[in-house]
């Protein structure tokens, strides 16, 4: 299956990238999914200029993207601290404070700076297919073409603000080989949609230290050959291609999977 189809699929609900006219994008959305509002997660996508006045991912949100762990850690009563190792924080130094860049850094070489062009035109990692998306209509068309159906759904996280300590309450598998769409941390509204071979997506119910209940989209990669080897070893003391590695997905991203139930198009 072509990744282009996956890409737009994922980005369809999530990456209604406001580079084209907002009204036409929303009209097209409604023509396919009547009475289905765009999720709050995608509020920036309603900006006609396709550009925000500040970076979309704030400093306090970066830990949502920098917590690596093993698949066997996904079980009830497991404790997690977001951004749980000093080594991870030092390895992904371009993303430890809010600056332009890409938050999903486990697939990147370690660089102090990265432009939008650097990322979007860089080679893909092993087992990865990626695409930067800037047109809502083309995304929708490709998603529907890929699945052959409009029955798809986007799943995202809703981490509690200013909370970084959580206990797992429940784990639910939602699908294999999902397409992930990440908002890139640039003022220009662009999403990176990528698929990595041999992945499993979960929704993990969490309870924060203050009692707030939340859900975290989680992805486990069974093929890790394309990951950043330095980060992977420093965080978990494992080498590429040896064991499955998992990570949470922050609030400014979503996974697209087929919708086999009567659920709403976009959830969480």
UniProtKB/Swiss-Prot annotation:
Kindly give the InterPro entries that the UniProt entry links to this protein. Answer: BURP (IPR044816), BURP_dom (IPR004873)
| Superkingdom classification of source | Eukaryota
Where does the signal sequence lie?
1-22
Q: What are the protein's UniProt keywords?
A: Signal
UniProt key word Ribonucleoprotein: no
Identify one Pfam family in the record.
BURP
**UniProt-listed SMART domains:** BURP
For whether the record's keyword set contains Signal, the answer is: yes
Q: Which residues form the BURP domain?
A: 68-259
Q: What is the protein name stated in its UniProt record?
A: Unknown seed protein 30.1
Species annotation = Vicia faba
């Amino acid at each position: 299956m072509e990744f282009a189809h996956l890409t737009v699929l994922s980005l369809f609900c999530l990456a209604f990238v406001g580079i084209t006219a907002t009204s036409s994008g929303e009209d097209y959305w409604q023509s396919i999914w009547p009475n289905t509002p765009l999720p709050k997660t995608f509020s920036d996508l309603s900006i006609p200029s396709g550009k925000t006045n500040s970076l979309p991912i704030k400093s306090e949100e970066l830990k949502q993207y920098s917590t690596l762990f093993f698949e066997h850690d996904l079980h009830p009563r497991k404790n997690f601290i977001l951004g749980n190792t000093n080594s991870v924080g030092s390895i992904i130094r371009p993303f430890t404070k809010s600056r332009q860049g890409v938050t999903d850094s486990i697939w990147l070489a370690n660089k102090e700076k990265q432009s939008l062009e650097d990322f979007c035109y860089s080679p893909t990692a092993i087992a990865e297919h990626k695409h930067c998306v800037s047109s809502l209509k083309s995304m929708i068309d490709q998603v529907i073409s890929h699945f052959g159906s409009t029955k798809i759904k986007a799943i995202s996280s809703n981490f509690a603000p200013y909370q970084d300590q959580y206990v797992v309450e429940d784990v639910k598998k939602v699908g294999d080989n999902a397409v992930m769409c990440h908002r890139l941390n640039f003022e220009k509204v662009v999403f990176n949609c990528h698929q990595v071979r041999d992945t499993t997506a979960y929704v993990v119910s969490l309870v924060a230290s203050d009692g707030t209940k939340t859900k975290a989209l989680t992805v486990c990669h069974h093929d890790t050959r394309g990951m950043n080897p330095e980060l992977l070893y420093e965080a978990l003391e494992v080498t590429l291609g040896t064991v499955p590695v998992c990570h949470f997905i922050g609030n400014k991203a979503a996974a697209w999977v087929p919708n086999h139930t009567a659920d709403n198009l976009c959830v969480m």
